[in-house]
Amino acid sequence: MHQVLDAELLAASERRGGEPARVLDVGGGSGVWSVPLAAAGCLVTVVEPSPNALATLHRRAEDAGVADRIVAVQGDTDALGDLVPAGEADVVLGHGLLEIVDDASAALSALATAAAPGGAVSVLVANRYGAVLHRALAGRLVEARRLLDDDTGQLAASGEKVQRRFDAAELDLLLVGAGLVVEVLQGQGVFTDLVPASELDASPSAAEALQELELAAAGRSPLRDIAARLHALARRPH
């Protein structure tokens, strides 16, 4: 997914005549995505409801020397239209967002509205079938069956923050329903959580081989469909 994002951000900068790409990171938390993007030269606005997360973001940005490239806005996704201008962001990020909001469809529509015409929306979500597989392999068979049978991919009454998980078809329909054109729908973490750490430690070349395998498998169904996460890049039409 990093290659996809890097290519999109480069194209956005070129469309601006070499000026920095403008990124909106919704639910951006403590800056896991925004700080590296700012360090790469982007101008980033982060919308995040948690003041504690924003405080951590500020410290991270200061430490990285990119505080002047990040604007932090405290607020919820359902108020996004009141917090940021519509149609201005070259790339809108919703990474780890759609699983925890009350209304995933409304949230995605808000992300689409914030994107400039021709701009992109990048979403990263928990994969329902990946969660089923990982729990089964860990011996948590009852949880695996509950996740498989639940329409939202949620472990009801478990106290987990996640309200839903997605499969590839559901995510595609959600993006199209928000008026976006899906260009990339790939898996992230097909094998990484399954390969024993001892195997990676045993060979100096194993980590590189795993990365190459992940890249090769990311867009191939059915391997994509059992990844830990699903990443999509969708475009707002002109």
Residue ranges and their predicted role:
Residues 184-238:
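Conserved Class I S-adenosyl-L-methionine
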Residues 19-27, 120-149:
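Conserved class I S-adenosyl-L-methionine
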Residues 93:
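A conserved beta-strand element that flanks and buttresses the S-adenosyl-L-methionine
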Residues 162-179, 185:
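Short alpha-helix
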Residues 105-120:
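A short glycine-rich, Lys/Arg-flanked "PGG" loop and its adjoining helix->strand segment in the class I
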